[in-house]
Amino acid sequence: MSQVFDASAFLATCSARPGVYRMFDSETRLLYVGKAKNLKKRLASYFRKTGLAPKTAALVGRIAQVETTITANETEALLLEQNLIKQWRPPYNILLRDDKSYPYVFLSDGQFPRLGIHRGAKKAKGRYFGPYPSAGAIRESLSLLQKAFSVRQCEDSYYANRTRPCLQYQIKRCKGPCVGLVDAEEYAEDVRHSVMFLEGRSQQLGNELNAEMEKAAMALNFEKAAELRDQIALLRRVQDQQYMEGGSGDVDVVAAFVNPGGACVHLISVRGGRVLGSKNFFPQVGIEEEVAEVMAAFLSQYYLGNAERELPGELIVNVVHEDFAAISEALQTLRGRELTISHRVRGTRARWQQLAVTNAEQALNARLANRQHMAARFEALAEVLGLDEVPQRLECYDISHSSGEATVASCVVFGPEGPLKSDYRRFNIEGVTAGDDYAAMHQALTRRYGRIKDGEGKLPDVLLVDGGKGQLNMAREVMQELAFTDLTLLGVAKGVTRKAGFETLYLNDVAHEFTLKGDNPALHLIQQIRDEAHRFAITGHRARRGKARRVSSLEDVAGVGPKRRRDLLKHFGGLQELNRASIDEIAKAPGISKKLAESIYASLHSE
């Protein structure tokens, strides 16, 4: 029990009505938010002398202050609790990390509409289908629709400026509406079929296509009949993959699984009897909670926390919780529609439920196995480097450029659970001699660790540099300049053969040179973080180089300033299309005279 907080005095004045409570530490930091039908009874349970779970006891030991807000009923308490959790994300609450908006398939308005992926507010005019649980699931649907019905998926700006059909037309994924190769009536029929599929009416669509195929065959239009046959075969394959036996309506199947290492919630989205996809969630579990507590927290945050998320008619769950009635009532209050939460289900629905449980268990076990595998690598690295403690943070730096052009330095960060991608950084290197990797490394490290010295960011336990002796010496120089002399440094060189597994390593100075056997877990970790730094640097370099090259060929043309360059690239849909354009086509762009078009064409084709 907390020695600071007087629980007895607090409970003596605490209300027994419904409400929300907030627990703070001695520095007034919010630790935990909860709700209760009976505030006094619920809060008293925290201050029992025995029977507390270890993490609950740890929370209670930090409590210095408790505030309560009385509400009219439990539903109001639930809504307030979710708002506070979303706003403050207290460390001891179960937190749903994934709060991104979910993607929809978007069908634009117009005579020749496009299909695409949409996230966020639905401002554009058109139709929205979904939401889909992941970008992967939505890409599968769009790929199928492109193969089956050839509705365009290009951006409107690209479409509007085509003068010849693109590659999608050549591979029969588009019918070329941009250059008039398909009439509006045929295209509208393809759009209608796509909508039927997206609305879950695949059975009706299949029957309709069958009838059209027979009609085409009777009319001896065998080419059309063959096209319809291929569409039907594709739809049947998808039905076999996506349809659940006995499925109908809109259902989310949600299963939670908990073990001492963490928690996983697996969600399967079924719309119109068709599986749109599934997704794993790994909530941050702050207190040792039962699986039912994890489920209740997930349902509250997932469905109450996002007003734009579309609700199914029913949830099938694998556990029950006393809050389910309040959650249903809150959804009806907030969203204006009922949501049935089912637990005892039979037959096919029971199989759905068990499938979700199995997926949640397997996903959590795989995540924990990977975490344990990574932890073993960190322990091996500590042993190899002679560290007193297992490092908790590794940083690795790499440099990427093309003959000195568009130099980019990367910083990637790993912890015992894997990559910490939110801490990754890239540095655009300026003002150094082209191709001078040492100067580039000096600039990147000075910028990064200068900020750390000023209190921004965390100091790693081990700093790795890709490049061997020279880069390690440069890292030592920067650390000495900034007075980080105790930081462990590790240089990674490719070795004589330049093959993976034969790296030469340098610890702290070039005199301490060593190698590791190819099966050493520490070497595997070094290779993993080195390769990730290399990948991150290359992608940044390519993006920077591509951006520079998009405008460099136009920069020397008199009369083409930054705004006109942007307008030209927008008009043609990119530099590649502008390169393909003739002088006459360039002259048709807004604000471009024939003389200026000739200058632009000459600049683009000067090499």
UniProtKB/Swiss-Prot annotation:
Pfam families named among the record's database cross-references: GIY-YIG (PF01541), HHH_5 (PF14520), UVR (PF02151), UvrC_RNaseH (PF22920), UvrC_RNaseH_dom (PF08459)
Domain called GIY-YIG: residue spans: 16-94
Coiled coil stretches, renumbered: none
Gene Ontology, cellular component aspect: cytoplasm; excinuclease repair complex
UniProt keyword annotations, A-Z: Cytoplasm, DNA damage, DNA excision, DNA repair, Excision nuclease, SOS response
GO MF term list: DNA binding; excinuclease ABC activity
Gene3D superfamilies reported in the protein's UniProt record: 5' to 3' exonuclease, C-terminal subdomain (1.10.150.20), GIY-YIG endonuclease (3.40.1440.10), UVR domain (4.10.860.10), UvrC, RNAse H endonuclease domain (3.30.420.340)
Chief localization: cytoplasm
Domain UVR: 203-238
Superkingdom as given in the UniProt entry: Bacteria
Localization: Cytoplasm
Gene Ontology terms: biological process: nucleotide-excision repair; SOS response
Membership in a protein family: Belongs to the UvrC family.
PANTHER family tied to this protein: UVRABC SYSTEM PROTEIN C, UVRC/OXIDOREDUCTASE
Described purpose of this protein according to its UniProt entry: The UvrABC repair system catalyzes the recognition and processing of DNA lesions. UvrC both incises the 5' and 3' sides of the lesion. The N-terminal half is responsible for the 3' incision and the C-terminal half is responsible for the 5' incision.
Subunit comment: Interacts with UvrB in an incision complex.
UniProt-recorded name of the protein: UvrABC system protein C
Organism per entry: Pseudomonas putida (strain W619)
Gene: uvrC
